């Protein structure tokens, strides 16, 4: 199963996309820290912040498991509130990565020795 892993760098404000065939991500949850070596980033430590499945349904941290559910929302990830007090039932994925997930969002927690984007760092 191929995963697209988006790595966000909070220092530069840029994000980088990698692909991996690793099954080491299956079973991990939102908030777990993983090694950057899974996406060829030696020395980096990444934190899983979200993702989406093959149909485009977003993952949500407070839905436990890997299944898709229709939940009633009033705010938070997966729902943009248009009016105050408005609630809506939305289809969302759970917080666990399974074979149905295609996109995984991560952020850098610990930096490695090599630059993230592949371009050399300036010495200015």
From Swiss-Prot:
GO terms for cellular component: ribonucleoprotein complex; ribosome. GO terms for molecular function: structural constituent of ribosome. The keyword S-adenosyl-L-methionine does not apply. Pfam families: Ribosomal_S6e. Keywords: Ribonucleoprotein, Ribosomal protein. InterPro entries: Ribosomal_eS6, Ribosomal_eS6_arc. GO terms for biological process: translation. Belongs to the eukaryotic ribosomal protein eS6 family. This is Small ribosomal subunit protein eS6. It comes from Methanococcus maripaludis (strain DSM 14266 / JCM 13030 / NBRC 101832 / S2 / LL).
């Amino acid at each position: 199963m191929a995963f697209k892993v988006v790595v966000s760098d909070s220092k530069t404000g840029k994000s980088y996309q990698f692909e991996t065939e690793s099954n080491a991500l299956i079973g991990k949850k939102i908030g777990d820290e993983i090694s950057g070596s899974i996406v060829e980033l030696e020395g980096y430590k990444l934190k899983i912040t979200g993702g989406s499945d093959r149909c485009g349904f977003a993952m949500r941290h407070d839905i436990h498991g890997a299944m898709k559910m229709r939940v009633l929302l009033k705010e938070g990830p997966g729902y943009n509130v248009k009016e105050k007090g408005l609630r809506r039932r939305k289809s969302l994925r759970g917080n666990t990565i399974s074979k149905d997930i295609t996109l995984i969002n991560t952020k850098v927690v610990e930096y490695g020795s090599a630059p993230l984007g592949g371009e050399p760092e300036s010495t200015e």
